[in-house]
Amino acid sequence: MGKFHTTLPQSHIPWILSQPVFFVSTAPLSPQGHINVSPKGTFPNINSFGYIPSHDSDPRKPAQFWYLDLSGSGSETISHLYEPGNGRITIMFCEFRKAAPRIVRLFGRGKVLENGTKEFEEWTKKEGVEVIPGARSVVVVEVELVGDSCGFAVPVMEFRERREVLNEVFRKRVERAEKGVSEESMQR
């Protein structure tokens, strides 16, 4: 049986921050549009995602979850968040390790801070986020509701390693751009 919380229980935060993968889901407002679900890998050595609790100075301000969005395939999540009147987003974490089963969903409204903008620069500096090559944006989610369910049907899987392919592609692009190879512009 699932439970819903208006705030994220403090006991969940270390668990969330230990996850090697999470899933992001958005949808357009149009009934003809498709729901988009994207897996997101995390990075152990950089501050690539996190949780910002509500501020005591304004308890009405919701807590926030954020992640560093990298270039790669499409940018459907961003296009859904930019759609006028939309902004709906769900972040889902699952326990795949041999630990107590659990699924946590963060429901909220997302905002895109695009790389190259003043807002992105100020936000990443304030939050101590290392901007790596290929970082297209930061997605900030104002968490409106937290769903917590058992996860009894989620399989147990062993995490082996992170894929470094995308990071390596962008590292090489930076090297070529620094050598003056103009056709190798950095995508955001």
Regions found by a protein language model. Name each.
Residues M1-R188:
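Binding-site signature for planar aromatic cofactors or substrates
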